[in-house]
Structures are given as C-alpha cells and as structure tokens.
Regions:
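Phosphate-handling substructures
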Residues: 66-123
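Active-site-proximal alpha-helix that buttresses catalytic centers in soluble enzyme cores
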Residues: 2, 7-71
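Generic beta-sheet signal
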Residues: 4, 49, 135-146
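GST superfamily/GST-like fold recognition
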Residues: 145-149, 174
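Short beta-strand scaffold positions
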Residues: 53-54, 122, 142-143
C-alpha cells in the first residue's frame, strides 16, 4: 500500500492583492503562501516520499518547502483558463457577464478558449500514472486546486476544491485509490 499526498500550492502573490483566475498564469507564492508551504512541510518532514510538482512557479515553490528532490511533470499544471487566464474576477464579470453568471450555478460550463474538464482530467490522471510508475513507495503531488478538484470529484464524487496549502491524503492499493479518512470510498486506477 502506498500513500499519496495531494498538495495544493500555497496562496499566490496576487498583483495588487486582487484575486484572479490563474489557470496557467505563473505567479510566485505570497508570504502567507510560503508560510503555508513551511507548515505542511513540517507535517511531512518524517515521511519518506518522492515529490512531483507542476512546473508553475507557485507549485514549485511549495514543493521546495519539502526539501527533497523534485520531479517536474508538465501534466500536473492547472487547467488552462483560456481567455479568463490572468484576469481579475471583476474584469471577468465585466467582459463576460453572461458566462460568469451562468458558471455561478454550473461550474461545468466551459470557459472561452479554455481546456475542457475532460481533457484536463485525462491529462492529470496520466500524470498521476506517470508519478506512480516513476517512483517506489509514498509520493507527494504538488499542484493546483482546479485540476485536483476535477480528479477528486470524478473519483470520490462530492468534493470541494482543496484550499491553499491543503493536503489530501489518499492510499493506493491494488489499483485503487482510497481516501484515508474514509476507506469505504475508492477508485480503480
């Protein structure tokens, strides 16, 4: 049995403190985000793990807090947000009012020019499979909330986007993922 720690990067350093739709926008961590990374690294300091990370800076900086070699996997990147990538939510509300309002009720409505949820999920699952094949024992996957939420929702149904710096612990046994806190729910991989 292997333990997999899915770790969402810490809080990014948003320009002028305005939250934005990040997608592939490459921001560093804020001071709070660096602290979040150090906090979770403390919790994992005695764990023997292989660390995999998205290539985006906020994920790499988070992974660096673990003080272990990092294997970068391109397919761990966040979903592309298309035309919304890098825009503040106020800019999105102004430029795309109909889609913004509709997505408040249904997050499956695609963003203009963005990667589809299906393509993103397939990409992330391929990255998870690659990480499993390239490592022995336990591993940490440092990445992004949107893509992780898709994976978790697809396999465990009711799941919210992980918070900044949050760790989700899964067990992997005989081709299935099991939520550590609820071993009744599992997914074959």
């Amino acid at each position: 049995m292997r333990t997999i720690y899915l770790i969402r990067h810490g809080l990014p350093d948003f320009p002028l403190g305005q939250r934005m739709c990040l997608g592939r926008t490459d921001l560093p961590l804020s001071q709070e985000g660096l602290k979040q990374a150090e906090d979770f690294a403390e919790k994992l300091k005695n764990q023997e793990i292989t660390v995999f990370s998205s290539p985006l800076l906020r994920a790499r900086q988070t992974a660096e807090a673990l003080h272990r070699p990092i294997i970068i996997l391109e397919d761990l990147q966040e979903l592309s947000a298309g035309e919304w990538d890098g825009l503040t939510f106020q800019e999105i509300r102004t430029r795309y009012p109909e889609i913004y309002a509709a997505r408040a009720a249904d997050k499956t409505i695609p963003l203009p020019g963005a990667e589809s949820n299906e393509d993103g999920l397939k990409r992330f699952e391929n990255a998870m499979q690659t990480a499993m094949e390239q490592s022995q024992g336990n591993l940490a996957i440092v990445g992004h909330g949107g893509i992780m939420a898709l994976f978790l929702k697809a396999h465990f149904r009711h799941w919210e986007k992980p918070g900044y710096g949050q760790i989700i612990t899964l067990l992997y046994d005989n081709g299935r993922f099991i939520k550590q806190e609820d071993s009744q729910k599992c997914v074959h991989f």
